[in-house]
Swiss-Prot record:
Organism expressing this protein natively: Jannaschia sp. (strain CCS1)
Co-factor remark: Binds 2 Zn(2+) or Co(2+) ions per subunit.
Family: Belongs to the peptidase M20A family. DapE subfamily.
Cofactor(s) it depends on: Zn(2+); Co(2+)
Domain of life, source organism: Bacteria
Catalytic activity, EC: 3.5.1.18
Protein name: Succinyl-diaminopimelate desuccinylase
Amino acid sequence: MSQIPTHAPVDPVALTADLIRCNSVTPLEGGALVLLEALLSDAGFDCTRVDRGGIANLYARWGTRGNGKAFGFNGHTDVVPVGDEAAWTHPPFGAEVDGDWMYGRGATDMKSGVAAFAAAAIDFVRDTPPDGAIVLAITGDEEGESTDGTIALLDWMEEVGERIDVCIVGEPTCPEQMGDMMKIGRRGALTAFFEVIGKQGHSAYLHKVINPMPAVALLGHRLSTHTLDEGTDHFDPSTCAITTIDTGNPANNVIPAKTRMTVNLRFNDLHSGDSLTAWLREEADRVAEDTGTTIRMTTKLSGESFLTPPGDLSDLVGKAVQAETGRQPTLSTTGGTSDARFVKNHCPVVEFGLVGHRMHQVDERVRISDIEDLKRVYGRVLTEYFAG
């Protein structure tokens, strides 16, 4: 016989509104994690603040450590700046409702996702306490540098012997309709910064100068037109895009001494940050030799590509999505990076959340009925996971 609920269910829509009203523009905590800690503690979760480097993080676990299997949720409460507040039709931290829409910064990315999994987890442990543990790892550093957020939580977990066996990151994953996409991996991201150095001089005396501009144009052409691969079963082809070329030369009769170029690569599991850095260095050296310039290069790796192969976890989430939304989510690795790139070093991870095409925009908003659907999806995932 199923257990009769003894508590009123947590309203994920009201919780989303409460979180939106917290001004938590990264790296500010803004009261969002304080609010969640109070709510989760009241529901019997053991909460620990894992702050590092001025960043606030919250680790909440229900269940005895080491007792049975552990299901994890990961998300963030920090948000990007609002931009031109005068352009908003609703206050960005007002959580105002207009029809089936709630407006506010973080409405989509991703205070609604955090509210949905927190509400689902609380209701689940109150109504059907599992033989195991549920962990919520929530950071205030995803939209910023991401160095003291989920990484800090995972480092702390390793130090104290905490673990999760599988994890859902609640980022907005659906491009058009609630339930239409789940992320089972992400492309890697690498940025390269080039400084091309020539010899400054008068543009009328080209024999006395070394112009860095043709060199940077040649390098940019070689990098951006090179076919890195044709893609794989689960990944699109890797790409290399020029994002900036800067000279800072206001004079029309002076050959500049140097120019800078930045390129951004998004790569699949046929490559690594090291292999692509080696390729970039080789191309830069070739252009430098051909043009008589000196080319300096530095790189920043935001994350390696990763894949959680289709299997038990994606099947579990996919069936829950199908049951609650009527849609079978496409398994995808598209989009930018997320904190799943850190979680994947700890346990199998997939991402599933709301429709994301309004995130980071003026008048960011979320469909209220989608928040309710997402809570039900997460609740069904927990039910099926602990029943297995």
